[in-house]
């Protein structure tokens, strides 16, 4: 199987790990196109909390402040992750473009989505040859992302190591459930 398209889903919680570094390293090594998908997870107000807050201005104010703080953290995390992406492109000399050009040099693109990481990965992940995710033991928040990639797409998944590798492919572990979706 030739790997020419790579998806690297990131959220605020997983951007501090190394899936971005690993995805761009793989793209560079395989002359592939990596799409980094930064998912701004929606701030959802808990219905039960909203009902409890009904008629209590102090609780409503606290919920509004929490939602505003979460949105601010999302924006800050997005800016930091995008800066890291731009720095890595320059360091690895990877072209920034929306689509790959067959047989060309490695390339990468940054896309932003709103929603949940699980939904985005399950909806779009199967369109890629490889999905690179953060290691769940290092980042508990990445566990649902790993599961969505593994079980929701049928695509090969590369779990990024806890530290960015200097080279890719020296140590490899393959897991396969012999299911039809995993056989492609």
Language model features with spans:
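Structural beta-alpha unit
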Residues: 1, 43-44, 52, 69-131
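Acidic/glycine-enriched edge-of-secondary-structure segments
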Residues: 106, 145-148, 170-176
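Short secondary-structure transition/capping segments
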Residues: 53-55, 80-90, 143-155, 183-184
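Gly/Ser-rich helix-loop-strand patches that form or flank binding pockets
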Residues: 16, 20-22, 110-112, 118-165
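Small/aliphatic-rich secondary-structure junction motif
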Residues: 1-67, 164, 168-184
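Short glycine/serine/threonine/alanine-rich loop segments
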Residues: 32-33, 94, 155
């Amino acid at each position: 199987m030739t790997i020419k398209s790579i998806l690297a889903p990131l959220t605020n919680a997983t951007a501090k790990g190394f899936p971005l570094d690993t995805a761009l390293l793989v793209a560079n090594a395989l002359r592939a196109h990596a799409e980094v998908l930064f998912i701004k997870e929606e701030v959802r107000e808990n219905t039960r909390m909203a009902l409890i807050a009904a008629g209590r201005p102090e609780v409503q104010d606290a919920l509004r402040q929490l939602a505003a703080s979460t949105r601010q953290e999302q924006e800050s995390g997005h800016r930091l992750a995008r800066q890291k992406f731009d720095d890595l492109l320059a360091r690895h000399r990877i072209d920034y473009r929306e689509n790959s050009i067959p047989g060309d040099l490695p390339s990468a693109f940054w896309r932003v989505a709103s929603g949940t990481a699980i939904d985005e990965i399950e909806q779009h992940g199967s369109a890629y040859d490889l999905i690179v995710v953060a290691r769940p033991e290092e980042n508990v928040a990445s566990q649902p992302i790993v599961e969505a990639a593994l079980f929701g797409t049928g695509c090969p998944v590369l779990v990024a190591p806890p530290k960015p590798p200097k080279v890719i492919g020296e140590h490899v572990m393959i897991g396969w459930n012999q299911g039809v979706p995993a056989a492609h």
